[in-house]
């Protein structure tokens, strides 16, 4: 697994705003947007591209276009704040969604949504989640992607803990991780220390979803057959974490409104 820690004064300044407990929700979202753009910039440095010929208002010129833009996969709910800036940098990118809450007693991941293309072989994927703490939710997400054939996976996070990096390395040894910081570890509540708190709460307010809420039902059989006949069509369903997924979860997440 390749881990890249962004070393840049602008990234460090935005990370400081995110860490500061005095930062309000609007300031937190703005700093997260800026830092996400920096992460996407670094993560796409070696993106495949092709040369094209264009015309300026003055003359012919050579240009560049991306080949096979990645699928963006935010982990709900905190990852939602990274989608807009990622799409601003990669306007051709499509977006899938994975929803994972956490049980506040056990810190185990509680999956409730997987809206992803059925086939991801040969397609690069960028997973967006501000916090990589225990790695339980990320391992679940990586498992969903791997079962759909994804092999080119990049994880973008603002802050990572060694425990989360270890979980990613165990689940997807060939994945790449781009982060603004690797902190020292987790506390007893499975939060990153020093971290930045609960990234979902700090963007959107307190999370009212609890792990006791029932999982979303499977789609009706007829709809499932229709989706299976259409390659690349997204399916939205609740999926359980794989048996190899770590059992802890760093923060809460909420289902979309």
Swiss-Prot record:
Its EC number is 2.4.2.9. Uracil binds at residues 192, 197-199. It comes from the Bacteria. Residues 203-257 are annotated as: Disordered. Its cofactor is Mg(2+). GO terms for molecular function: GTP binding; magnesium ion binding; uracil phosphoribosyltransferase activity. Pathway: Pyrimidine metabolism; UMP biosynthesis via salvage pathway; UMP from uracil: step 1/1. This is Uracil phosphoribosyltransferase. It comes from Mycolicibacterium paratuberculosis (strain ATCC BAA-968 / K-10) (Mycobacterium paratuberculosis).
């Amino acid at each position: 697994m390749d881990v890249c820690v962004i070393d840049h004064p602008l990234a460090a300044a935005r990370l400081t705003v995110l860490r500061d407990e005095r930062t309000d929700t609007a300031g937190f979202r703005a700093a997260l947007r800026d830092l996400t753009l920096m992460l996407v910039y670094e993560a796409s440095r070696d993106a495949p591209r092709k040369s094209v010929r264009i015309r300026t208002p003055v003359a012919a010129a050579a240009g560049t276009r991306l080949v096979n833009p990645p699928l963006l996969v935010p982990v709900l709910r905190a990852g939602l704040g990274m989608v807009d800036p990622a799409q601003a940098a990669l306007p051709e990118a499509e977006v899938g969604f994975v929803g994972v809450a956490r049980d506040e007693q056990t810190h185990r991941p509680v999956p409730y949504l997987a809206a992803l293309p059925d086939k991801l072989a040969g397609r690069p994927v960028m997973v967006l989640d501000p916090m990589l703490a225990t790695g339980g939710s990320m391992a679940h997400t990586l498992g969903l992607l791997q079962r759909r054939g994804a092999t080119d996976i990049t994880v973008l996070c603002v802050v990572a803990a060694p425990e989360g990096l270890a979980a990613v390395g165990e689940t997807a040894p060939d994945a790449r991780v781009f982060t603004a910081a690797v902190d020292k570890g987790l506390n007893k509540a499975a939060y990153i220390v020093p971290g930045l708190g609960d990234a979902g709460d700090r963007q959107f307010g307190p999370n009212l979803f609890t792990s006791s809420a029932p999982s979303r039902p499977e789609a009706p059989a007829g709809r499932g057959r229709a989706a299976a006949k259409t390659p690349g069509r997204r399916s939205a369903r609740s999926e359980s974490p794989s048996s190899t997924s770590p059992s802890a979860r760093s923060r809460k997440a909420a289902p979309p409104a």
